[in-house]
UniProtKB/Swiss-Prot annotation:
It is an enzyme of class 1 (oxidoreductase). Keywords: Metal-binding, NADP, Oxidoreductase, Phosphoprotein, Zinc. One of its GO terms (molecular function) is alcohol dehydrogenase (NADP+) activity. Homodimer. The gene is ADH7. This is NADP-dependent alcohol dehydrogenase 7. It catalyses: a primary alcohol + NADP(+) = an aldehyde + NADPH + H(+); (E)-cinnamyl alcohol + NADP(+) = (E)-cinnamaldehyde + NADPH + H(+); 3-methylbutanol + NADP(+) = 3-methylbutanal + NADPH + H(+). Zn(2+) 2 binds at C100, C103, C106, C114.
């Protein structure tokens, strides 16, 4: 199959002009023996795309292509690829594009925590200085390990958000024993939190949804939550649900705004609070000494290839349907999505589609 020497994408010129992305051509990174090229057909828009675009996490390189929840078809395979990936496969690509594959973390299926050669799918330099370019583009080039086959019964627009948002909440659920007989809380019912409810329920847990007010109650119950707590409006909820939860996953955009003095009261002894929040880079978390007696708190980031495969298997077998709004890939489409994300007007994930009309005519 033919493919272009240069790729095209919708780029952000700088953080001050994030509402006006432009169509640009760019050189892909040099093709490696273990690389694949993927012709993109859909890409989810994650909150981290917005954080980067507006400069919350640091400087934005000129004409940066964002997007890291990618679905597409493999069009080129490196000479030393060994995962079984082949031309024509429909694959998903998440937030990671490279790891060292040699350290203890990589060898124990924790490559997402590799500190030796960790490259994100976008906005991250390779060792040669090339800045990775993401999925708001015609193609993406990356290591085969991070191109994962998608089950046939998961439509591309619904599969895309699983590759970052979905795996980010699934990994702590999986690692902390979410399943039948467990009581699991999800704090923050946004894009990731709504997937947390769906996935925890699909895994067999009793699910508690937590939000600040009552505006998310109806949606949370439709998603499958068994209980709903409006933390700023309901009275006496810490007493009502005392010692209730085995696991609480914090999906809100800010961890520092979580009231741990209240949250710890509803945790079982030995329970776990796991944060997957991705706040602004300067945010600080302050905890009272010994304020979490008998309860552990930790953080989690994305997930391994093995965990993504387990997630896709669960979604396929349980026919989990995340709530997605489709938008056309274009300068206007990306700007529209970011503008609505700024105001919180998303129910509950955006996926960019119509790549064939924009790039593959």
């Amino acid at each position: 199959m033919l493919y272009p020497e240069k790729f095209q994408g919708i780029g952000i010129s700088n953080a001050k002009d994030w509402k006006h992305p432009k169509l640009v051509s760019f050189d892909p990174k040099p093709f490696g023996d273990h690389d694949v090229d993927v012709e993109i057909e859909a890409c989810g828009i994650c909150g981290s795309d917005f954080h980067i675009a507006v400069g919350n996490w640091g400087p934005v390189p000129e004409n940066q292509i964002l997007g890291h929840e990618i679905i597409g078809r493999v069009v080129k395979v490196g000479s030393k690829c060994h995962t079984g990936v082949k031309i024509g496969d429909r694959v998903g690509v998440g937030a990671q594009a490279l790891a060292c594959f040699e350290c203890e973390r990589c060898k124990s299926d924790n490559e997402q925590y590799c500190t030796n050669d960790h490259v994100l799918t976008m906005w991250t330099p390779y060792k040669d200085g090339y800045i990775s370019q993401g999925g708001f583009a015609s193609h993406v080039r990356l290591h085969e390990h991070f191109a994962i086959q998608i089950p046939e019964n998961i439509p591309s627009p619904l599969a895309a958000p699983l590759l970052c948002g979905g795996i980010t909440v699934f990994s702590p659920l999986l690692r902390n024993g979410c399943g039948p007989g467990k009581r699991v809380g999800i704090v923050g019912i946004g894009g990731i939190g709504h997937m947390g409810i769906l996935l925890a329920k699909a895994m067999g847990a009793e699910v508690y949804a937590f939000s600040r007010g009552h505006s998310k109650r109806e949606d949370s119950m439709k998603l499958g939550a068994d209980h709903y707590i409006a933390m700023l409006e309901d009275k006496g909820w810490t007493e009502q649900y005392s010692n209730a939860l085995d696991l609480l996953v914090v999906c809100s955009s800010s961890l520092s705004k979580v009231n741990f003095d209240s949250i710890v009261k509803i945790m079982k002894i030995g329970g776990s609070i796991v944060s997957i929040a991705a706040p602004e880079v300067n945010e600080k978390l302050v905890l009272k000494p010994l304020g979490l007696m008998g309860v552990s708190i930790s953080s989690s980031a994305i997930g391994s290839r093995k965990e993504i495969e387990q997630l896709l298997k669960l979604v396929s077998e349980k026919n989990v349907k995340i709530w997605v709004e489709k938008l056309p890939i274009s300068e206007e489409g990306v700007s529209h999505a970011f503008t609505r994300m700024e105001s919180g007007d998303v129910k509950y994930r955006f996926t960019l589609v119509d790549y064939d009309k924009k790039f593959h005519k």
